[in-house]
Amino acid sequence: MNVKIESSWQQRLQEEFDKPYFEKLVNFVKNEYGKAHILPPGHQIFHVFNSCPFQNVKVVILGQDPYPNPGQYYGICFSVPDGVAIPGSLSNIFKEIHQDLGKPIPNSGNLDRWVKQGVFPMNSVLTVRAHETGSHRNIGWETFTDAVIKKLSEERENLVFMLWGSYAKEKASLIDTDKHLILTAVHPSPRSADYGFFGCKHFSKANTFLRSRGIEEIDW
């Protein structure tokens, strides 16, 4: 199957695109776009891939579902466009960066500047029905994004994987810990951040690891 995606990802994921499950997934999602309000707009489904080529990835942040409210999600996990109110989880991420590194808390929740530096914030599920959280779980996206994690683990070295919350932590089994750093904590959601996300210091730990490998750190 021909999928419009950045060339370095195309090369490594074509095997997935050609599998029967992916064809079923695409057909399901296309049908959904035809009958319901689906997020993000179709051209933004692979936005994080198109913005961060395979060889540029330094830090992987794994989420679960896209934001279900129209105008928020545009294909980058946790991120929202300029001018959109910063969601609670992202606000807590910014607070932890402030506590960890002393960075001022941004006025915008747009994380494009992270992505340009090699941060790869990817949801496990890449589409959702508006106002219906989790409505596109178990249709095939998880199989695809698991393959993305495996491909990064196998073909790259010295990556940092940030796994927040029990769902993301389950993905640790896909990652080669001899080659990569895995950082785990509770989810930054307002419901859980006080129980181990605040104080996790993942952002300084990531930069320390990158520097130790001779890799330029992230300006969080």
Swiss-Prot record:
InterPro entries: UDG_fam1, Ura-DNA_Glyclase_AS, Uracil-DNA_glycosylase-like, Uracil-DNA_glycosylase-like_sf
Active site: D65 (proton acceptor)
GO CC aspect terms: cytoplasm
Top-level lineage group: Bacteria
Primary localisation category: cytoplasm
Keyword Hydrolase on entry: yes
Catalytic reactions of this protein: Hydrolyzes single-stranded DNA or mismatched double-stranded DNA and polynucleotides, releasing free uracil
GO molecular function: uracil DNA N-glycosylase activity
SMART domains according to UniProt: UDG (SM00986), UreE_C (SM00987)
Keywords: Cytoplasm, DNA damage, DNA repair, Hydrolase
GO annotation terms (biological process): base-excision repair, AP site formation via deaminated base removal
Pfam family membership, one: UDG
EC number: 3.2.2.27
Location in the cell: Cytoplasm
Keyword field contains Hydrolase: yes
Family listed: Belongs to the uracil-DNA glycosylase (UDG) superfamily. UNG family.
Role summary: Excises uracil residues from the DNA which can arise as a result of misincorporation of dUMP residues by DNA polymerase or due to deamination of cytosine.
Protein name as it appears in the record: Uracil-DNA glycosylase 1
Species, as recorded: Bacteroides fragilis (strain YCH46)
Gene this chain is encoded by: ung1
